[in-house]
Amino acid sequence: SRGLGDVYKRQVSMVQGVFAQKIEIKGTIRNATDNEATEFVNVVLQTTDSVFVNGVSTNNNGSFIFNKVEAGNYRLVLSCVGYNTQYITLNGVKRNTDLGDIFLEDASVALEGVIINGSNQINRPDRKLVFPSERQMKVSTNGVNLLQELMLPRIQVNPMNNEIGISGGGELQIRINGVKADINEIKALRPADIIRIEYHDNPGLRYGNAEIVLDYIVRRPDTGGSFGTDLSQGINAMWGSYNVFGKVNHKKTEFGLSYHMGPRDFYGMYRDNEETFRLADGNTTQRVEKGEPSHAMLFMQNLNVSYSLQASKNSLFSATFRLRGNNQPNWDYQGVLYNVNDETDMVNMIDRTKNSWTRPSLDLYYQQNLKKKQTLVFNLVGTYNREKSHRIYQESLHNEMLTDINNNVLGDKYSLIGEAIYEKQFSKGNALSFGLKHTQSYSNNEYRNGHNYDTRMNQGNSYIFSEYRGKINKLDYRLGISLTRFYYNQSGNDDSSKKYNVNPKATLHYTFSENSYLRWKAEVFNATPSLSNLSAIEQTIDSFQIRRGNPNLKSYMCYRTELTYEWKKGIFYSNLWGAYDYRPNAIMDEKLQEDNKIVQTWDNQKDWQKLSGRLMLRVGPLWDMLQLSFTGGVNHYMSHGNNYSHTYTNWYYDCLLYTSPSPRDRQK
């Protein structure tokens, strides 16, 4: 038997033709185990010195074809999830060439990769396969920096803080070889180890509520190791980002370690604020806060310790211990608070917050590839979260204390998440998957603010789903349905809340050509109230306001539909997107007047709606070092409360000019 990193090479010699012409190269990819045609295989045509020429994916019959190829010497690179990568050398191609059946051998979960000199991207109905070029890997220092080079749609990268986000908001899920990861594990990746990034902008039900999924497919060497650091330090302020990481491989096992430390210490932070209260009796109060320089200080640290075992080519087990911590001894504001209608009515204000949290977790993941293209995945995550918060708010005049608020909150939360997924792939790209996920959490909170309050919350969320993926000619479709059960109970409340929901989801993806497609998606899902909103404890904000939770909040349904059109040609790329959200009985805040106080609370309101549109244009890379992108859009919000109605329109745009040094400059 061959090992994990085996690469199969095949030499094909061509008979020289007598006519110089544009030729075609074609073939059919089959599974070496069962002789079935294999679709969605990435077929990349390169010159013999690894310069990218063209790239396609195999169709339902496992076939591929390259048209209008110049005569010459080439190399084919065949890669697909679950198979060993195969290289085929084509010498002296001068006539139409049919390679016939090409057989791919099954591989382990983490595959060996493809080295491509020209940037390449292959579209699939549910994701994009993005292959970094050799230049992009050479000018990047880690997995986050490489993402900046790729400039994927909607992905926002902050190179200063090594942070990744989504334009327009939403949950971003990061994975490495299919296993959930976090930003610090991506920072620890060496660009040379990254084969490709799978960009899911239409994730299936197995990914939960994720808006976008980024899956880094990386190499797994048989033996050896690596160690590195990534250090950044501000010059004029105490701002630092210090990263240390290492990895050791020995046969079937891999050990990894990464540590991040981020101190912040700023002087001169201030806050300007303006509030207007229109009271039920017809009076209006308008207050303005004029901030003065103050102090902010925090200390972040993250630790990852991982172990993985690939006992066979079809199985993968990984265990990751994560420790997250944030200590914020100072987050202080101070200034003058005055009445707009009478500026002589003013007080001195101090608002100081000290908090910290520690969050250890253990993540266990197991994947087993079975015969006949079947996959089983099990994931278990246990987390403990401990938080402390101390807030002091004071208003004074001429050294006389008018308002003195001292809030202390101590919280403990225990959670356990279990997940099981089964997937069966059929011919012609069809696939069926089932999944079960349950989240159980227990929280205890202690409130000390002149009174002592203790709350206990028990919350559970169960999720069962089934999804089918199919294809009819150029139309790909995905149909899914899930059943959710939400339960919670708060101490002191004899009644518990329990609700069941059925949530359908449908996606239609029509491919016009290799360069453009149109996709429509519609889904129904449920949203649950947060633990903080459910707590009936009152917390005083200032001399005028009180915050109070609502234990009677109910979960609610969310309806969403969106339409996407994408076109790309060479260095030009465009993406046009529109969406509509409708959420009846949405949880939104409301304000009540009780005596001379304003109470901020939450309730299930009439509905919340949102209309969105976005256009993205991108050009690059130019001269192998310059990329330009423009993103512009609009969000129109409509909030219909039980006693109010609000509308708001937000226009936005984002222009980015990104340059990177050439590999030669980087090496110098």
Predicted regions and their residues:
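Outer membrane beta-barrel strand-and-loop segments of large Gram-negative receptors
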Residues: 415-417, 457, 550, 554, ...
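Outer-membrane beta-barrel translocator domains and adjoining extracellular loop/strand segments
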Residues: 268-284, 330-346, 389-397, 444-452, ...
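Surface-exposed extracellular loop regions of Gram-negative outer-membrane beta-barrel proteins
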Residues: 211-212, 216-231, 331-335, 433-441, ...
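Structural motif
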Residues: 28-38
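Conserved small/polar residues in nucleotide/adenosyl-binding loops
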Residues: 2-11, 658-667
